[in-house]
A protein has these predicted regions:
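Mixed-charge, low-complexity intrinsically disordered regions
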Residues: 1-85
Length: 85
């Protein structure tokens, strides 16, 4: 997945991980050495840690009991409007 594809398909908003916890996608960024698209996101639980994950991995599916499921499913629009910050 290239950067433009990642920006157009992984939109800011609230997502649910296949294991049930929720996260907010903040941005799609570029890796400083490889330019690989990376998803910058934060946990919506606990200390609300901020994480990065390769965009290709974000969009992967996982198999559960023989059925393919998205690793992350978008469940709501962006929580914050970072342009107003």
């Amino acid at each position: 997945m290239d950067f433009e594809q990642a920006v157009n398909t992984i939109l800011p908003g609230k997502y649910r991980h296949f294991k049930g916890k929720e996260y907010e996608v903040l941005y799609v960024a570029k890796h400083s050495e490889t330019s690989e698209p990376m998803v910058v996101y934060r946990a919506l639980y606990g200390d609300e840690d901020v994480w990065v994950r390769p965009a290709g991995m974000w969009n992967e599916t996982v198999e559960i009991d023989g059925i393919e499921h998205p690793r992350f499913s978008r469940i709501a629009d962006a929580i914050h409007n970072w342009d107003d910050a």
